[in-house]
Amino acid sequence: MSSDRQRSDDESPSTSSGSSDADQRDPAAPEPEEQEERKPSATQQKKNTKLSSKTTAKLSTSAKRIQKELAEITLDPPPNCSAGPKGDNIYEWRSTILGPPGSVYEGGVFFLDITFSSDYPFKPPKVTFRTRIYHCNINSQGVICLDILKDNWSPALTISKVLLSICSLLTDCNPADPLVGSIATQYLTNRAEHDRIARQWTKRYAT
């Protein structure tokens, strides 16, 4: 009996020691297999690299084109127009258009925002008026209804040609394709009143 108790006591530390080792093992430590799963696959890495290269190529193409147009418009700006980057961002420009002589906007200075996307010149720039203007093809948010800024855009067009088209729109509006229907109707039915208000707005907001 005494011998059996001693044997039992001798075996207890061994059992306790084994339990202690299990308790000391860090349950949060990932198994080697788990660490393997967390690494991105070679296919995923290749896909990410390809997407990054494609984006960089698009930015490079658009930036080169915009730089080229900036050099051209600086050397030879369209009549009554100027344009260039707002700061260090080549994709964000500010433009100034002087009201065409003989138009109801004569004497006004109109500011516009120009935003190029990374898809330029395959997609048109976004051009909006910052200065308020009374015009049936330009709404109160400065959005311009001009076909070459929408469906009729072509990569062969440049920002200089866009500004020339906007100047032409200031000289001769297009009431057949209005953005502000009430102004278009007034232009067609009461031209004198239309011109009076347009000159009034030019004096109030653009001088």
Curated annotation (Swiss-Prot):
Reactions the enzyme catalyzes: S-ubiquitinyl-[E1 ubiquitin-activating enzyme]-L-cysteine + [E2 ubiquitin-conjugating enzyme]-L-cysteine = [E1 ubiquitin-activating enzyme]-L-cysteine + S-ubiquitinyl-[E2 ubiquitin-conjugating enzyme]-L-cysteine
Cellular component terms per the entry's GO annotation: cytosol; nucleoplasm; nucleus
Start-end of Low complexity biased regions: 50-63
Pfam family, one: UQ_con
Gene Ontology molecular function: ATP binding; ubiquitin conjugating enzyme activity; ubiquitin-protein transferase activity
Keyword terms: Acetylation, ATP-binding, Cytoplasm, Growth regulation, Nucleotide-binding, Nucleus, Phosphoprotein, Transferase, Ubl conjugation pathway
Listed pathway(s): Protein modification; protein ubiquitination
Domain UBC core: 61-207
Residues where Phosphoserine is found: 8
Keyword Cell inner membrane: no
Record carries keyword Transmembrane helix: no
GO term, biological process aspect, one: protein K11-linked ubiquitination
Oligomer status and interactors: The ubiquitin-loaded form interacts specifically with importin-11 (IPO11), leading to its import into the nucleus. Interacts with NEDD4L.
Function: Accepts ubiquitin from the E1 complex and catalyzes its covalent attachment to other proteins. In vitro catalyzes 'Lys-11'- and 'Lys-48'-, as well as 'Lys-63'-linked polyubiquitination. Participates in the regulation of transepithelial sodium transport in renal cells.
Protein name: Ubiquitin-conjugating enzyme E2 E3
Gene: UBE2E3
